[in-house]
Amino acid sequence: MENTLIKSIYRDTPAYLNQELQISGWVRTLRVSKSFGFIEINDGSFFKGIQVVFEEDLNNFEEIAKVATGSSLIIKGLLVESPGAKQPFELKAQSIMIEGACSGDYPLQKKRHSFEYLRTIAHLRPRTNTFAAVFRVRSLVAYAIHKFFQDKGFVYIHTPIITGSDAEGAGEMFRVTTLDLDALPRTEEGRIDYAKDFFGKETNLTVSGQLNAETYCMAFRNVYTFGPTFRAENSNTARHAAEFWMIEPEIAFADLQDDMELAEEMMKYLISYVLEHAPEEMAFFNEFVDKTLFDRLDNIVNSDFGRLTYTEAIEILQKEKERFEFPVEWGADLQTEHERFLTEQIFKKPVFVVDYPKDIKAFYMRLNDDQKTVAAMDLLVPGVGEIIGGSQREERLDYLEKRMAELGLHKEDYSWYLDLRKYGGTRHAGYGLGFERVIMYLTGISNIRDVVAFPRTVKNADF
């Protein structure tokens, strides 16, 4: 007999009622009396499990009555309407086979475990309700990202993980080397001789696929990259991880306004997609993780996102500067408390802040006519602050070369990037969206370590 997925039973119950079925899955809970027992089984196909009823006429009743939480079972039985109010149906077991017994020291017992504890058993935490919901939503959002861009005709570009350039100009990168660390080759000046390394030069793990994506934007018009990125920031906060995924579209013949319109459309699409395709998981998050979740997401889907310049934002914030821990001054980056005040107290909806001072933004952003600001945008959302950062890219070769010189970037390291401006360059724009930040926002989970399967953070690379 073929296995029937629990998801199929929930989605098309009438087709399975009063039918003999076989299911397989893991024991979540077990309750036994003298002559019968109840097992909650989850098979991984659906957020909810199914109740299995077994009675003393089962040929291995005594064995099943002692089965441990976490054990895997194969069960044949008749699906019937449940007399209890807690579930619409149950499986009356005709046979139960133990596929894999579970040891008595199984860490996941029937009680609430803290997120901190569950991080220490990251290989087992997907078996809990919370993390089953988190990672199913993560899977759905990943699919929705591809669907959104593919339906709009974007081309998906696989950008390299190993790179010889720093896309952000920040320098906080993980080094890639095959050199013997106990006997490093040196140049005459005493520096490490990377000419003897695997690639013949200094290489790192990528912090962004943007620069590489721009090359394909100049051929395919609209492209996106979606993959892992790495930041060696010594930042041990709930929002930072050393390894995370980024969504980075690039659009040609486009300016900052086009960039913001794409970002707004994408955010609304992702939220609507998850609410439609993961209703059980989202209801769980709204009830047990963040009771304002549905209201917050509904506000995004049904709002026209606000717009204001960085200068206007500073003027608003300076009128309320006494309430902030960090100072508010033109030329300084906005802190999370500033961002949240703007989006939660002033606009009460998502808002784009545009035209930031050039000195706090990356070299590739287009210089505005005032010569002081660049065509950059950040999307701020209630509850989080900044969630997307983007810009119109500098398409003018002379402006780009001047900006690189100001920042001490070597033209030879970016010659291929400069070529894009020499050979038929166009106006183009793009943005970056941290995938984990989206999952946190969609689920209400407050720590990035709890939306990554095996988080990589400062002093932590377990599993």
Swiss-Prot record:
Pfam families: tRNA-synt_2, tRNA_anti-codon
EC numbers for this chain: 6.1.1.22
Gene Ontology, cellular component aspect: cytoplasm
Top-level lineage group: Bacteria
Catalytic EC class: ligase
Signal peptide: none
GO biological-process terms attached to the record: asparaginyl-tRNA aminoacylation
Keyword annotations from UniProtKB, A to Z: Aminoacyl-tRNA synthetase, ATP-binding, Cytoplasm, Ligase, Nucleotide-binding, Protein biosynthesis
A GO molecular-function annotation: transferase activity
Catalytic activity: tRNA(Asn) + L-asparagine + ATP = L-asparaginyl-tRNA(Asn) + AMP + diphosphate + H(+)
Location of the protein in the cell: Cytoplasm
Subunit: Homodimer.
Similarity comment: Belongs to the class-II aminoacyl-tRNA synthetase family.
Name of the molecule in the record: Asparagine--tRNA ligase
